Every structure is written in C-alpha cells, then in structure tokens.
Amino acid sequence: MLLWYTTASIMRYLMVFMLFGIQCAAAIIYRGNYISLYVNSSATSIFLKGNNNDASIRGRFLFIGDQFPVTNTYNVTVELLHVNQTTLCLQPLYRVMYGECPRIRTGAIIACRVKRSWHYENATQLTDPNVEIIFKMNNTKVEDAGIYLLVVQLDYTSLFDIFFVSLNVYPKQDTSNEDVNYFPPVYSPSHILNTFKICHKFPVHNGMEQSILQHIVTSDVDTETENLSWQKDDLGSTQKPRKNFNPDVKVNVTHETRKTLMESSADVFMIAVPITASLLVILAIIIVVTVGIYRRRSSEKRKIYRPKRTKEQASTEKRERSESDVLLEAAVARLETIQEENPPHSVINPFTK
C-alpha cells in the first residue's frame, strides 16, 4: 500500500512537470549566420486592463556550430526597430552596444563589461539580452501591436543577422477601439527589407552612426519626416574596460550584398525544440521501471508474523498443554499394562475396559 501511494505521488509530480514542459515547448531557436536567438515564444499577447500594461519576451542569444567567435572577447551592437504598417517604414526605437563580452561556451552577449544604449525620443521599448530580455515595453497601447526587428552585428563581421518578434495587443471591451487593428501584420522578412524604408535618419551622436539597416534597405530615407533626436540612457559601464573600447560600428555593407543577405539572413532557420517528446520518453521509462519494481515486490513471499499473546492466552495454552500431557501419559501407561497382560499377537483395544 505504501508503494502504491508513493507511485501515485511520483506520477502526480511527473504530470505537473510534463505540463510545465509542454508550456515551455513553445520555445524556438532562430539560427542566423553569425549568432542565433533563443526565445520562449515567437509572439506574445497582452490584454489591456489597467495601469500596469507591460509586455516582455524573454530569451537569449546563442552561438551554434561554427558561430563561435575566434577571439576571447568581442563587441556587439543590437538595434530594435518597429515595422510601422501605416507609413510602411521601419521606426528605430532603441540601440545598445556591448563591449568586451567574454566568450562563454554557447552563451552570447553575457557578462559584457561595457554597455552604451540610446532610446529614440520617448520610446518605451527596449532590449537587453545581457539579462535575457529580448523585448520589453512599458505602458503598452493598442497601437504598439505589430512586428519588431532585432538587428545584431558582431564587430568581426561586416554582415548582420535580423530576427523578428511579434506583439499582440487586445484592447478593453469598449467601442472606442473597434476600428483599431491590434493584430500584427503579416509580412515576410524579405518583403520588409525590399519594401520598407527607415522612418527617420539616425543622427550621429556620441559614438552612434546611422542604422545598420540604413545600408541595406532599397528605399531612401524619408527626409520630409522630422529628424528626431536620440536620448542617452547609460554611457560607460560599472567597470573600467581592460582595453580601449571603440563603440563605433564600422559597417561595410553595400547594395550589392543585399541579395545574399536576403537569402541567408532574412529567412532565418527555425528549429523547434522537442521538449515535449523528451518528457514523454522520460515519463514512459519511469512508469515501466516503477511497475516492474511493484510486480517484483508483490511476487516475493511475505513473512508470516505471529501476533503477540496476552498473559491470559499464555496461561490457558499452558493449562491445556498440561492436561494433554497427563492424558497422553495415562494412555501410554495403560498401553504398557495391556501389553504385559496379553499375548504379543493378540488384538485388544487399549482404550476399552
């Protein structure tokens, strides 16, 4: 019985663990040319209900296969842009530069010693892969729904990788938002890079250059749009660099490389993580082992334990044993007497008078 309860408890915890694993199975790995992106989900949804309408997508960057950097440290730039479906342009939101990032196994952009970031105007979106935040937005509005681009470039390559994340925003149940399109638009990466243009030119400001995408989009910059400024977030770092860090990113991408980039980097290779299948296999193995142990223990011969006797039971058994011994001794004595009085081969019942 104890084994049965133990097995039931184990099964209950395994079911909870399996459900948690199924929930996490939505994780996806996007493989780029020089760096890969692991996200818990390719899209996130938020329901507007109060003052705290924050949205975030957690994940981290990885080095897979031949993507490992050749040096012990490297610098990297990450830009966050929003696909504006109204004006058909790419709206720059946030830019962060990491310096002196150590090469730590498969982890990318981890424990970087230098960080410099800029916000675009009053944008509330940001990305901070150093703390496993791929996308974060505060005070989300219905108009913020859509597709966001993460452009990542390492300092030892002239090309870059582009990753896409989507945000769904569901408004409150009222009539004021009925005409608002709060679902992300359906655009392919190649269509975005071929059709969309940069909404605003990136100003040169304290080590900043124009957007990495500025070199690759086919359309010219919208010069009629007001050139808004960047706001400095944090310049420098909490630690002193061990060597001179140049935050400027030298980009040598030209229009001739656009076609190659479209074929290799825009349509990233997606790998589904088979967490659910692994959990089911582990669960099946544990069930088989548990059932085998239960059957083996059930087939073993159980020990028979006599219950403890009370004093009254012991005295009664002793008295009955004494009476039986007396009767047995009397019968033996009677048998010996009969054998002496009668011939050896005579048949006489010793218990008759």
Swiss-Prot record:
<feature type="glycosylation site" description="N-linked (GlcNAc...) asparagine; by host">
    <location>
        <position position="84"/>
    </location>
</feature>
<keyword id="KW-1031">Host cell junction</keyword>
<dbReference type="Pfam" id="PF01688">
    <property type="entry name" value="Herpes_gI"/>
</dbReference>
<dbReference type="GO" id="GO:0019031">
    <property type="term" value="C:viral envelope"/>
</dbReference>
<dbReference type="GO" id="GO:0044178">
    <property type="term" value="C:host cell Golgi membrane"/>
</dbReference>
<feature type="glycosylation site" description="N-linked (GlcNAc...) asparagine; by host">
    <location>
        <position position="40"/>
    </location>
</feature>
<keyword id="KW-1133">Transmembrane helix</keyword>
<feature type="glycosylation site" description="N-linked (GlcNAc...) asparagine; by host">
    <location>
        <position position="122"/>
    </location>
</feature>
<keyword id="KW-0732">Signal</keyword>
<feature type="glycosylation site" description="N-linked (GlcNAc...) asparagine; by host">
    <location>
        <position position="138"/>
    </location>
</feature>
<keyword id="KW-0325">Glycoprotein</keyword>
<feature type="transmembrane region" description="Helical">
    <location>
        <begin position="275"/>
        <end position="293"/>
    </location>
</feature>
<dbReference type="GO" id="GO:0044156">
    <property type="term" value="C:host cell junction"/>
</dbReference>
<dbReference type="GO" id="GO:0043657">
    <property type="term" value="C:host cell"/>
</dbReference>
<keyword id="KW-0946">Virion</keyword>
<feature type="topological domain" description="Intravirion">
    <location>
        <begin position="294"/>
        <end position="353"/>
    </location>
</feature>
<keyword id="KW-0597">Phosphoprotein</keyword>
<comment type="function">
    <text>In epithelial cells, the heterodimer gE/gI is required for the cell-to-cell spread of the virus, by sorting nascent virions to cell junctions. Once the virus reaches the cell junctions, virus particles can spread to adjacent cells extremely rapidly through interactions with cellular receptors that accumulate at these junctions. Implicated in basolateral spread in polarized cells. In neuronal cells, gE/gI is essential for the anterograde spread of the infection throughout the host nervous system.</text>
</comment>
<feature type="glycosylation site" description="N-linked (GlcNAc...) asparagine; by host">
    <location>
        <position position="75"/>
    </location>
</feature>
<keyword id="KW-0261">Viral envelope protein</keyword>
<dbReference type="GO" id="GO:0055036">
    <property type="term" value="C:virion membrane"/>
</dbReference>
<keyword id="KW-1032">Host cell membrane</keyword>
<feature type="compositionally biased region" description="Basic and acidic residues">
    <location>
        <begin position="310"/>
        <end position="324"/>
    </location>
</feature>
<keyword id="KW-1040">Host Golgi apparatus</keyword>
<keyword id="KW-0472">Membrane</keyword>
<feature type="signal peptide">
    <location>
        <begin position="1"/>
        <end position="20"/>
    </location>
</feature>
<feature type="region of interest" description="Disordered">
    <location>
        <begin position="303"/>
        <end position="324"/>
    </location>
</feature>
<feature type="topological domain" description="Virion surface">
    <location>
        <begin position="21"/>
        <end position="274"/>
    </location>
</feature>
<keyword id="KW-1043">Host membrane</keyword>
<protein>
    <recommendedName>
        <fullName>Envelope glycoprotein I</fullName>
    </recommendedName>
</protein>
<comment type="subunit">
    <text>Interacts with gE.</text>
</comment>
<dbReference type="InterPro" id="IPR002874">
    <property type="entry name" value="Herpes_gI"/>
</dbReference>
<feature type="glycosylation site" description="N-linked (GlcNAc...) asparagine; by host">
    <location>
        <position position="252"/>
    </location>
</feature>
<feature type="glycosylation site" description="N-linked (GlcNAc...) asparagine; by host">
    <location>
        <position position="227"/>
    </location>
</feature>
<comment type="similarity">
    <text>Belongs to the alphaherpesvirinae glycoprotein I family.</text>
</comment>
<dbReference type="GO" id="GO:0016020">
    <property type="term" value="C:membrane"/>
</dbReference>
<keyword id="KW-0812">Transmembrane</keyword>
